[in-house]
Every structure is written in C-alpha cells, then in structure tokens.
UniProtKB/Swiss-Prot annotation:
Enzyme superclass (EC): ligase
EC numbers for this chain: 6.1.1.6
InterPro entries according to UniProt: aa-tRNA-synth_I_cd-bd (IPR045462), aa-tRNA-synth_I_codon-bd_sub2 (IPR020751), aa-tRNA-synth_I_CS (IPR001412), aa_tRNA-synth_I_cd-bd_sf (IPR008925), Lys-tRNA-ligase (IPR002904), Lys-tRNA-ligase_SC_fold (IPR042078), Rossmann-like_a/b/a_fold (IPR014729)
GO cellular component: cytoplasm
A GO term, aspect molecular function: tRNA binding
Species of the source: Thermoplasma volcanium (strain ATCC 51530 / DSM 4299 / JCM 9571 / NBRC 15438 / GSS1)
Family: Belongs to the class-I aminoacyl-tRNA synthetase family.
Gene3D superfamilies recorded: 1.10.10.350, 1.10.10.770, HUPs, Lysine tRNA ligase, stem contact fold domain
Motif 'HIGH' region per record, residues: 23-31
Main location: cytoplasm
Catalytic activity: tRNA(Lys) + L-lysine + ATP = L-lysyl-tRNA(Lys) + AMP + diphosphate
Single biological process term from Gene Ontology: lysyl-tRNA aminoacylation
Top-level taxon of origin: Archaea
Name the UniProt record assigns to this protein: Lysine--tRNA ligase
Length: 503
C-alpha cells in the first residue's frame, strides 16, 4: 500500500493536517518535503471519504537568530527581533513576508490548498491565550517533563513564555518574573521593566511548548515533521507528553520524514546558503514533477536531488510512470504515485520528450521554429500552450543547471572539423545510403549503427564522428533526434562540405 494511504487507513472522523515553517530565509526545495507530504496525506484522507482541513503555519514571531550568509551585516541590529518586525531585504514590506509570499505562489502552482496562518495572528487574536495561561499555571509540571526527556536541568524560575520587549524590540532577551492572567511581568537585558498581555502578540512560547499548544488550540490530528524533531528526546517527545499531561489531548499522528539532500553537497539549509529556493526550482521543472519527486519516495528515506543531469533522469522516470498509467499497466503503488503527483488528472503527458526539447532549443532560437520542429517529430497533436510552458522550463534549466556535456552550439559553416581517415570513411558511407533511407530519428540511429558495423568499428566511434562535425565535441544529444531536427538537406550539405574541405 502506498505510504500515505497506509498512514491514514485506520483514521476515523474529521482530520486536520498541519505543517509549518519559520520564514527566516528562502523557503527551499528541502522544505517542500514537509508541505507536500502534508498535502499528500490531506488528499489521502479525502480519498478515504473523510472530511479534512489542511493548514500551513508561518512562525513569523520567531526571532532572527543571527545574520545569515544572504543578509547584509546591517541586519545585526535586528538579531532577536521577531521576523515580522524586521524590514524586508528588498526594502518592501517585512522580512517574514519577503520569504513567505514567493512560497505561497509555489503552493498555488503545485496544487497545495493549505490555509496559511501566521503565528502572530494566533497570538494577536488571542487564539493561544488559553494555552499560554494553562502552561504558565502548570509550569512546574512542564519543567519536570522537559528535564526528564531532554536530560537537561533548567536553572532558576521557569516561565514558558518569552515577552516581546516594548523598548528594544527583542523577544530573546527578556525574562518573566511574575504572572497573573493576562499579564506576564518581565525584565529585559536592555534594562526595561514591563508587562506583556498574553492575549496579544506581545510575546511567544518557546518552541517545545508552543508546538503542543498549537495542536491543542487548532485541534491538529496529523502532522509530518523532520527527523530532528522526531529524534529521541526531541521536540515531538516533549510535545506529546505536554499534549497528554497538560492539555489532556492526544498528540497528532506523526509522520517523520528524512531530508532532501542536494546531491554531492549535503542537506539543504537556507541558514548556510546551501539551498535552492522553491520559487526558483519551479521555473525549471513542472509542478507535477516536483510533486513526483516527493511522492515516489517513502518519507522514511532521504531524497538525493540533482538539479543537473538528475533532473533529466527524473523527467524520464516520470514519463515512464505516465505511460504505464495511461496504458493501465501499472501496480497499485505506482498508480498512487502518479495520482498524487498530478494536479490536473487530464494532464497525463507532456507535449514532447524533455531531452529532445533540450536539443531543439539549442538548434533553434525562435519559439515558432521550436514548435515547428517539435510538431514534425511526433504524430501526436501538440498543445501549443503546454509546449511553450515546457520550452520555458527547458530554457531555464539549460541556463541555470545543465552540465557542460549537455550544452552545445552548432559549428558555423567555416568551422570545419579535422577528420581522420576513419571519420571520412564513416561520413562517406553514410552519404552512400542516405538517399534510400527514411529521414526519421529511429532510421538515422539504425543507419549509423549499420555504417559502423559495415566498417568494423564500434558505434560510439561513429557517433563521435557526427558530433565532431556538427558541434565540435566527442559526445552530444541523441543523434537520431539531433540529425532529424537539423533536417536531411542541412545534414547532407554539411557532411559534403566537411568532406570537400578535407579532401
């Protein structure tokens, strides 16, 4: 059974799935695993016939913890400020929205219907006030839970609330000295003494307490989260104890997921600068392919993401799944993977093979010429709008992530390759049979193989000869498609020119 269907198979009644993030930096491809895992679980619950709601929490009350690599050093004065109270790096609006808003657009494009809720609104509208009052009154019990599970002693008076200093603006430099509903009395390292109203966005709970408080206030029943939270002694271990013993609720059904690794570099973290923003990757791959990247791998396994050649391989794999799905020759898990990947069920194919399109856009410059060549290479009716979208993805990928061995440029007529006797023999033999061959990609491919066989040489050597003549490299795109799209007249004329120039 597919992992999401297995996770929800025993659930009854209405469900609320929650995911979230602290918008401290660019929300990246690695973060997509959480929200897409949540979305797939949400859709699995709906498929079971249960009512469901899906929320995405933006923790904009979290403080800026340091000056990250992508920030100017002038942001040092904002360390400790809530993210919602810091100017945006681009000078427009606030810091948290600067990173959240592009991600909301990614959510829309990838078919994620989650309601976005800002934590500052939960505090500001008093939604968490009851939970705060409860944890403040029962702080000694919470202290015991934290110490037993984490193995770390908490020194001095413990109040599970962090007031926002009304003087210096920091939320990480205050200490509560007394509490009487609804006010937490505090002092700040800046020297200020004041009172914070727990019914307003005048402070926040520490993460280990805030998380179960959200479960309680929002009635969360399912939540995926990363393995760091799910580790022994981690925040889920403390959260479920607080949920049961302090709030009297069952903790959400957990689904722990592994990280997405940037191939050859490690886990993605916006705080280290090792990350690809989700808003950027959605420009180089269709949203369905991003969903497929997540859906096809059980959350318990990490994902190696390679935006270079690996993206082409991922596209190939996706097309294989789609073909089997269309033909009805597919197992249950693979069928589920495709159905949870698709945004529109009618979109069961892409206009043209992505690798082939990468070749076309390097041969032709104008979209109209690419469209004409694409139409000539398939018997299927092409959706022009969908093809133009795919052209956009292909061009962006070629510009940003394509390895050098995929890129090529046609040699000009005066850039003639130096040919060996073997090269000349291969090209001459190809010319001999070219008049009688059908000019399609499969026939061209077979002909080059047969030429190599007739001359007693390996096919790789024959292919290299053609790449040398047309792009000045030893390797290149799939030769049959490549020569087909160059056209028979152009191909034959170029070969004759090169042979004549080296005679």
């Amino acid at each position: 059974m597919f992992w999401a269907d297995a996770a929800v198979k025993d659930l009854i009644g209405e469900q609320r799935i929650s995911t979230g993030i602290s918008p401290s930096g660019p929300i990246h491809v690695g973060n997509m695993r959480e929200i897409l895992t949540g979305d797939i679980l949400y859709k699995a619950v709906i498929k079971r016939g249960l009512k469901s709601d899906f929320i995405y929490l933006c923790d904009d009350m979290d403080p800026l913890r340091k000056v990250y690599p992508f920030l100017d050093q002038s942001y040092s004065k904002y360390v400790g400020f809530p993210l919602k109270n810091i100017p945006s790096p681009d000078g427009v609006g606030v810091y948290s929205d600067h990173f959240l808003n592009p991600f909301i657009e990614v959510m829309r494009k990838t078919g994620i219907p989650a309601r976005v809720i800002k934590t500052s609104d939960l505090y500001g509208n008093g939604i968490l006030a009851d939970a705060i009052d409860t944890v403040m009154e029962r702080r000694s019990e919470i202290k015991d839970i934290l110490e037993k599970i984490t193995g770390r002693m908490i020194e001095g008076d413990f109040y599970p609330y962090e007031p926002l200093c009304e003087k210096c603006g920091r939320i990480n430099s205050t200490s509560v000295i007394s509490y009487k509903y609804p006010y937490a009395e505090y002092t700040c390292k800046c020297g200020h003494h004041g009172f914070a109203d727990i019914r307003r966005a005048e402070g926040k709970m520490p993460w280990r307490i805030e998380w179960p408080a959200k479960w309680y206030a929002l009635k969360v029943s399912i939540e995926p989260f990363g393995k760091d939270h799910g580790a022994p002694g981690g925040s889920y271990d403390t959260g479920k104890r607080i949920a049961r013993e302090i709030f009297g609720i069952e903790p959400p059904l957990p689904l722990v997921y592994e990280r997405i690794m940037l191939k050859g570099k490690g886990a993605m973290h916006s705080s280290t600068g090792l990350a690809i923003p989700a808003s950027e990757i959605i420009d180089v791959m269709p949203p369905e392919l991003l969903r497929f990247l997540i859906a096809r791998v059980n959350p318990s396994r990490h994902i190696d993401f390679d935006p270079g050649l690996g993206l082409l391989n991922l596209f190939d794999e996706f097309e294989r799944y789609l073909n089997k799905y269309r033909e009805g020759d597919i197992d249950g898990d693979s069928k589920a993977i495709i159905e949870y990947s698709l945004i529109e069920k009618e979109k069961l194919s892409y206009p043209i093979d992505f690798r082939h399109l990468i070749t076309l856009i390097q041969i032709y410059q104008k979209k109209e010429d690419i469209l004409r060549a694409a139409m000539a290479s398939t018997k299927d009716q092409l959706d022009e709008s969908a093809l133009y979208d795919e052209i956009k993805y292909a061009k962006n990928w070629l510009e940003r992530y394509a390895p050098d061995n995929v890129k090529f440029k046609l040699l000009a007529i005066d850039e003639k390759a130096e040919l060996s006797d073997q090269d000349r023999a291969i090209l001459s033999k190809f010319l001999e049979v070219s008049n009688s061959m059908a000019w399609d990609s499969n026939e061209i491919h077979s002909t080059v193989h047969n030429v190599a066989k007739d001359l007693g040489i390996g096919p790789d050597a024959a292919f290299s000869t053609f790449y040398k003549v047309f792009i000045g490299k030893e390797r290149g795109p799939r030769l049959g498609y490549f020569l087909f799209n160059l056209g028979k007249d152009f191909t034959i004329a170029r070969i004759k020119s090169v042979l004549g120039g080296n005679s």
